[in-house]
Design a protein with these regions (language model features):
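Short, hydrophobic-biased segments on the C-terminal half of alpha helices
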Residues: 49-50
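Amphipathic alpha-helical dimerization/coiled-coil segments
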Residues: 1-4, 22, 77-109
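Beta-hairpin "wing" of winged helix-turn-helix
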Residues: 53-71
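A cross-family signal for key residues in well-ordered alpha-helices
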Residues: 10, 22, 53, 59, ...
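N-terminal helix-turn-helix DNA-binding core of bacterial DNA-binding proteins
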Residues: 3-43, 66-81
Length: 109
């Protein structure tokens, strides 16, 4: 799994990582702050952060002894753009199906 979108979607597949991204959408946070709502260890949160960082979904910086994480929007934009192509495809096909079914109903009358 080496292509960028696969790495992004793999990172997004985990509900804990999605919750971390939701929290980071509000602003930067430390590992301790990110761990507060979860019943998992700090090392487990750090592993989740490493996955998110590898996918480019977050960036991390160090100030003195604190290590903050922040959301990076570009990879989410890439995933959204990919999904948008398929949303349009299904919208168009379902609209055509709806029109076809309405024609069939009219023919039955």
């Amino acid at each position: 799994m080496t292509d960028r979108l696969s790495v992004i979607f793999s990172a997004l597949a985990d509900p804990t990582r999605r919750a971390i991204l939701t929290r980071l959408a509000e602003g930067e946070a430390t590992v301790t702050e990110l761990a507060e709502p979860f019943d998992i260890s700090l090392p487990a949160i750090s592993r989740h952060l490493k996955v998110l960082e590898s996918a480019g979904l977050i960036s991390r910086s160090r100030t003195a002894q604190w290590r903050s994480s922040r959301l990076e929007a570009a990879p989410l934009g890439e995933a959204t753009a990919w999904m948008e192509r398929y949303r349009r495809f299904w919208d168009e096909n379902l609209t055509r199906l709806d029109a076809h079914l309405k024609r069939l109903q009219e023919d039955d009358k």
